């Protein structure tokens, strides 16, 4: 476990990974220049933001204030109590947040002091003018001019936190740090769950993703002992109504501050989980017109539950994907059997859901992991540095069909030049791949060349969780443009 940190501030040993985040926070919090500065830390709940910021405040002798859903008056009293603990001396009455921010900035004139306000959206809900107050005190003539306070605003309500620095928001242009704490990448997640078997790692990640709190807090360190223990683990954890993880996917949607019609939003997520990835397909599934779901789609994107992925080969086309694996698992496996699951019938339901789990959960998720592999790959894997990684559809008019490219890797765009294709890839989780998959990718490569893409030197990649036929393996040895990626390669450092 790395203990990397900023100059003179090693990362605490109890923090797993997060080296880059720690270095960024330490660099911001120890900046000795005069003038209060602002940092914004966001990310979905349970990613370890509070854990990270508490460690920072403790390491640097700063202030950590966890806000609650309370009135302004009560929040100010609690904030005053925190200031008293920090200063170890009386604090004058704080009539409002103007007094509070001015007093706070006056505490740290001699050396930089990190001040963390966690769950900041709770304070904004009760005191909508607070961002404007902070903006004024950070500005010319404000109390922050002679201060060295390093104010860090943190929150999990992504729509609120994203809006703090957007458009005409008061704090736009004021932040010296904007840090989003993401889930662990798939390789880090495997290490976090102490899983060395790559097949088990994929199955595990397809259920819980890279959210650290699911293991530490919601499951009390319960993880599958080996591949044979995966099915029993699913039954005793995520399908067990006695565990907090059982209802977690429902709570994730409830956190969205703009969500007024939960049934519509759940239906949109169910549509995507069922494979309806376009706005038209989603609208048809939920029984609404396309223009009636544009707002729910935007809100789900703002909440980081959905992502909109452009088709790399068809301009203006895009598909939607669920970001949080647990939500996909819930919509595909749990929602339709919720009443029986609450009665403790998880074992029977799980055994009857294996086909759906493989096709709707693991298959699409494995494709996403392969795209993540491509994003992180060295330039020699594709014959050049990836500029954009995604998926796309290539129309084959002659054969009246479409070729879906699961992992498309494009070189960085160059003005005045055709877009260069580095690699076209197909992904199969539970199927042995053979030469016909290569032939389909080569057909797509030829079609893209006709459409104006630069496909010279473009490689074909086959990604498989079940292996490759002997014929395909032999072809790889004689054909330099064929590349096979198995689970061991996917998880190799």
State what each model feature region is.
Residues 312, 318, 323-493:
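A cross-kingdom feature that marks ATP-driven nucleic-acid transaction machinery
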Residues 1-347:
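Phosphate-binding site recognition
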């Amino acid at each position: 476990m790395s203990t990397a940190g900023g100059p003179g501030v090693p990362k605490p040993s109890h923090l797993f990974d997060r080296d880059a985040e720690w270095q960024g926070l330490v660099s911001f919090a120890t900046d000795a220049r005069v003038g209060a500065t602002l940092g914004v830390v966001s990310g979905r709940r349970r990613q370890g933001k509070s854990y990270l910021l508490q460690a920072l405040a403790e390491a640097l002798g700063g202030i950590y204030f966890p806000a609650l859903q309370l009135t302004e008056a009560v929040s100010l009293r609690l904030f005053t109590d925190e200031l008293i603990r920090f200063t170890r001396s009386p604090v004058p009455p704080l009539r409002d947040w103007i007094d509070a921010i001015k007093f706070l900035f006056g505490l740290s004139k001699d050396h930089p002091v990190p001040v963390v306000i966690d769950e900041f959206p709770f304070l904004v809900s009760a005191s909508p003018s607070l961002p404007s107050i902070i903006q004024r005190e950070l500005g010319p003539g404000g109390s922050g001019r002679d201060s060295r306070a390093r104010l860090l605003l943190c929150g999990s309500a992504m729509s609120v936190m994203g809006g703090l620095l957007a458009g005409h928001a008061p704090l736009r242009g004021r932040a010296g740090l904007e840090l989003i704490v993401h889930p662990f990448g798939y390789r880090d997640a495997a290490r976090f769950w102490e899983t060395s078997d790559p097949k088990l790692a994929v199955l595990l990640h397809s259920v819980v993703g890279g959210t650290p709190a699911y293991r530490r807090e919601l499951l009390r360190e319960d993880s599958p002992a080996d591949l044979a223990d995966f099915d029993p683990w699913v039954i005793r954890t995520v399908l067990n109504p006695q565990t907090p993880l059982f209802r977690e996917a429902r709570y994730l949607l409830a956190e969205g501050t703009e969500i007024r019609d939960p049934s519509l939003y759940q239906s949109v997520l169910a549509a995507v989980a069922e494979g309806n990835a376009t706005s038209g397909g989603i609208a048809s599934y939920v029984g609404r017109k396309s223009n009636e779901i544009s707002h729910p789609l935007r809100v789900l994107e703002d909440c980081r539950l959905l992502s909109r992925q452009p088709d790399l080969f068809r301009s203006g086309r895009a598909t939607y994907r669920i970001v949080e694996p647990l939500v996909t698992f819930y919509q595909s496996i749990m929602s339709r059997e919720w009443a029986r699951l609450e009665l403790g019938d998880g074992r029977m339901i799980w055994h009857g859901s294996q086909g759906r789990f493989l096709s709707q959960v693991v298959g699409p998720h494995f494709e996403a992991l392969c795209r993540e592999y491509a994003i992180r790959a060295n330039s020699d894997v594709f014959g050049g540095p990836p500029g954009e990684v995604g998926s796309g559809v290539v129309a084959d008019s002659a054969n009246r069909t479409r070729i879906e490219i699961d992992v498309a890797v494009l070189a960085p765009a160059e003005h005045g030049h055709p877009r260069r294709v580095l690699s076209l890839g197909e992904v199969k989780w539970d199927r042995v791949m053979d030469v016909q998959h290569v032939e389909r990718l080569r057909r797509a490569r030829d079609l893209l060349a006709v459409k104006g893409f630069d496909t010279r030197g473009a490689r074909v990649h086959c990604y498989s969780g079940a292996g490759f036929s002997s014929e395909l393996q032999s072809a790889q040895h004689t054909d330099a443009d064929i590349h096979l990626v198995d689970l061991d390669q996917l998880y190799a450092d």
